[in-house]
Amino acid sequence: MPLVDPVTMSSSAIVKGAVAQSTSTTKSTPGSQATESSTTTAGSSSSLATLRPVQIKQTPAAQTVRHALPAALTALYLLRFDALVTNPVPVMLNALPVVAAFQMTYALLCLPAAGEPASKSNRKPRPGEKKKGGDIGSSTIITALLASVLTSIVTPFLYFAMVLFGAPFLTHGSHTFLCAAHLALLTLFPLFYVHGVDSAAWAAVGGFRAPLDETFGGLVGGIVGAWLGAVPIPLDWDREWQRWPVTILCGAYGGYLLGRVLGGTLFWGKKF
């Protein structure tokens, strides 16, 4: 006859069974948690692994714009450099729509829009096959407009980031804001057009884990160039071009063009 516990009025065999069951449940819990965590980690790793470098469209117009745009931006900056040194605010303000038109043309003709399959954007028509809708459709135009809106929204945050890194706050506010607008238009607009609001893609971009291409290379080059452009400002050279933010803007444009060219050619597909 099994012994009965006078307090719980249950047999010792039942108590031992309950204890053994709870122990086995406790032991199995860490394993299940480890399985869930490993599944989550594998899912995030797979999402990063599927992020591929952006391929430029292979149409003749895309290849022409791809190579002509860096020369056009360089010519624009060199032609307006003296005026930029003399009066930076109106020069940056007047150049902003021109740069926006350049970037919009580059995105529409050269880059695949967010959500567009890469195979569809890069597929060449077969002999005798007519391409439907042309290269630019209503969806790509809407994507470009949304990318412009997102770039405008991010510009104030980029302005405050520049202030945190030492930009003038009480003075030269318009100078800094227009410089931030140029930097956002150069580096962030193509990324918004390509990736949209994909959280996994932006996590890879923000963590510098994305593969290098023209869009991500332009971002890295623009940031590094703007940072290096701040070096000559405090130096005692007494040059007119040391005014804020001439060297910052010069470094941003030069770094963006260099990073974009290298990211699209020599370092395409590589990671940090």
Swiss-Prot record:
GO biological process, one term: GPI anchor biosynthetic process
Molecular function per GO: mannose-ethanolamine phosphotransferase activity
Ranges annotated as biased composition (Low complexity): 32-48
Record's bilayer topology term: Multi-pass membrane protein
Region annotation Disordered: where it falls in the sequence: 21-48
Location in or out of the cell: Endoplasmic reticulum membrane
Regions of compositional bias (Polar residues) in chain numbering: 21-31
Function: Acts in the GPI biosynthetic pathway between GlcNAc-PI synthesis and GPI transfer to protein.
UniProt-recorded name of the protein: Glycosylphosphatidylinositol anchor biosynthesis protein 11
Organism per entry: Neurospora crassa (strain ATCC 24698 / 74-OR23-1A / CBS 708.71 / DSM 1257 / FGSC 987)
Name of the gene encoding the protein in the UniProt record: gpi-11
